[in-house]
């Protein structure tokens, strides 16, 4: 029950940060659709390569919300490196909080 509360708290924080101007980075269009369905209203960017995505997000507050699988972790790691070259420190803690609660059942953003 506590994990479920933590999950919903993390989703509410995601929605609030997005509404406050944070940009959410995801892997694909299904992820965008899923986040819209749960009420994320702000800008959502689909990952399109490390350099181009980092350049596009330069100077913005960023939440990396890639899938909880090896591809998602590789994208997260590369984006962290690329964004840090611009002096940007994206939020990855929210992803950890969301998937920590549900990782046994859900590993993809589109399944949220």
Describe the residue ranges of each PLM region.
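Phosphate-handling DNA/RNA-contact segment within nucleic-acid enzymes
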Residues: 1-23, 29-36, 56-57
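Short active-site oxyanion
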Residues: 19-24, 42-43, 61-62
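TOPRIM fold recognition
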Residues: 29-38, 45-48, 52-112
């Amino acid at each position: 029950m506590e994990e479920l509360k933590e999950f919903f708290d993390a989703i509410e924080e995601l929605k609030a940060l997005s509404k406050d101007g944070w940009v959410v980075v995801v892997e694909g269009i299904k992820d965008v659709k899923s986040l819209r369905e749960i009420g994320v209203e702000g800008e959502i960017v689909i990952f399109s390569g490390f350099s181009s995505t980092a350049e596009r997000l330069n100077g913005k507050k960023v939440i990396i919300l890639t899938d909880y699988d090896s591809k998602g972790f590789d994208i997260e790691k590369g984006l962290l490196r690329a964004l840090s070259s611009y002096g940007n420190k994206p939020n990855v803690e929210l992803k950890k909080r969301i998937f920590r609660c549900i990782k046994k059942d859900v590993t993809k953003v589109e399944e949220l």
